């Protein structure tokens, strides 16, 4: 399981200025605030025209000329300046992959000490949708046993403050534990690099992550559909 929320994409104006620096073509930039008419970016030169609901909400929109230049540039360094901030809740086994693929530029997280003791462990804290009980193999019910053991260690830690019980939680905790919410900063260039590697990944979480990439604003700058 993976949960992505509080997404914010920024840096478009800086990226466009930097992209146009080599040719001194800043005056050709046609992006700006949407007002639905000639004051600001109008519908005729809006790159988001086809999918727009035409609410004229004074949001910033990418112009067709800027969009066309972005699509044509072979050296797309401007993507590094389009920053994406988001919160991700995912299991430990996914976070290990996350750092392997270097998806994030910066990550803020809580300390393991405070996080593990904050609440009792429940089945909802684990990604276990693929666990089954089959014949003599009781994989799913074994998780219940582990949860009981974790809660026993947690209670002893809260009562005694003895760190040896905290170690019981740390070293017994399964990689499927997904109560791991972290705030991530990345950019369009990084997402462009990892998308081809991850979109057909064995882990469901990476497939869902790539679906999220596909839904980002102007995601055509990130990947080529085939």
What are the roles of these predicted feature ranges?
Residues 1-225:
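Family-specific signature for flavin-dependent thymidylate synthase
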